[in-house]
């Protein structure tokens, strides 16, 4: 299967990727977002393809041109590449095409078409992909059963300008997973609940592990902390066992 996957990826890129423009096919949002979301873009081209996707969204006034099939990949591509700021701008629009416009047209459920026109269904879930980011990005709760057991639950909230707090709760097969965060200036407080018998990998937006506290004490002395490491220059990763945790970061990245 690994060999087939590698062969399919190479064929896909050979036929659809333009190395001169760093775009797929005709460069639409869906064309660039889908390969980013499912891992088909060569590692040394990911940043450039992402940049093209973001530029396309900005050029359309923070509107999306993707429909039911493609919007899912746009959300995933931006979320997995830490561009929650772009998603927030996109989801905050009130003119068509947008969720805000659906509300302005009197919708009480998701409509089939972005412009909420009465010719289409007025109760249709096909454009509901934004909740992927609300739970997985803004709330920061993600589960991946392909990962090692200790990191299947990943907590990585994406704080964005314009949002000072958020909370999310997900009833998974492992038990309830919950997060609540509050930002005041550069200070961030994050509450996390990990279900019994599980562990979680928590990514905190700072490069200074020594400044992070959990329930008022440093990470090295806090109960339930199994591992502390620097993911990169912008994150500290903390692995914890089951229980409730209250982190505080005085200066987020």
Regions from the PLM with identified roles:
Residues 1-122:
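Catalytic cores of carbohydrate-active enzymes
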Residues 85-253:
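Non-catalytic C-terminal accessory modules of carbohydrate-active enzymes
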